[in-house]
Regions:
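Short beta-strand->loop
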Residues: 92-102, 177-183, 187-204
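Alpha-helical "hinge/linker" immediately C-terminal to small N-terminal DNA-binding modules
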Residues: 1-20
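Hydrophobic hinge/microswitch elements
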Residues: 63-68, 72-76, 132-193
Length: 237
């Protein structure tokens, strides 16, 4: 048994070298919808490089609806998405968190004097909303929040991209309800304030999930998910 220990240790070292060599030769492809690409992914990729040194990571940023087909074609190894409203039997989803929402306010807007806002504060305020076709989660959330408050949103403009929405806020076209991580997009004069419900709790109704092809096996993806699960609370702030 004593003689076998060096052999076992050598075998483990060889296995590690083979695994690391394979990682160095492979490109690991992560898809992320824009909010996750802005807030969650940078620190995750940084830490993943420490777990798997030498691995080349390719980040593909796109809308959730466009990322899911790329999983099925093999163009992506994993994706961080808003889970779809229709079943996807070929894709495995693991819920990560419900992202909070914030209100983006134009330069000098009186509501910026508040530390936090309720939907009622946005009554009659011109609103920029996402396109319902390309961003159904965000659009439906905005409309539902006003409906629950028995209010009709004053829609001034629709736009698809978060950057465009925030730029329009900066141009004083209106305010916008956006995901928390969008607040990391810096546009001159735009102020972000947390959106809370009547109980004073953050409005957290934008789900975020990890997705991959159901039944597939990938040790790098497993390593990434282990890291993500262990640091999710840290990454979410």
């Amino acid at each position: 048994l004593r003689d076998a220990r060096p052999l076992l240790q050598h075998a483990e070292e060889v296995s590690d070298r083979v695994r690391n060599s394979a990682a160095e030769e492979r490109v690991f492809r992560i898809g992320a919808m824009d909010s996750a690409a802005t807030g969650l992914i940078p620190q995750l990729v940084h830490d993943f490089h420490e777990v798997v040194p030498g691995l080349e990571v390719l980040l593909v940023e796109d809308k959730s609806a466009k990322l899911l087909p790329k999983l099925l074609t093999g163009a992506l190894d994993i994706a961080i998405v808003r889970p779809p409203m229709t079943p996807q039997p070929a894709i495995e989803f693991e819920f990560l968190l419900d992202e909070p929402t914030v209100v983006a306010l134009p330069p000098g807007h009186p509501l910026a004097a508040h530390e936090q806002l309720r939907v009622e504060d946005l009554n009659e305020v011109p609103m920029i909303v996402p396109s319902p076709r390309s961003r159904p989660h965000s659009y439906n959330l905005t409309m539902q929040l006003f409906l629950d408050a028995s209010l009709q949103p004053n829609i001034a403009q629709q736009a698809e991209e978060k950057q465009t929405i925030v730029n329009m806020v900066g141009a004083d076209i209106g305010a916008a309800i956006v995901p928390y991580w969008t607040s990391r997009i810096a546009v001159q004069g735009v102020a972000y304030r947390p959106l809370v419900n009547d109980a004073g709790d953050l409005v957290c109704e934008l789900p975020l999930s990890a997705a991959w092809v159901k039944g597939s096996h990938d040790h790098l993806r497993d390593d990434l998910m282990t890291l993500l699960r262990s640091k999710l609370e840290e990454y979410s702030h």
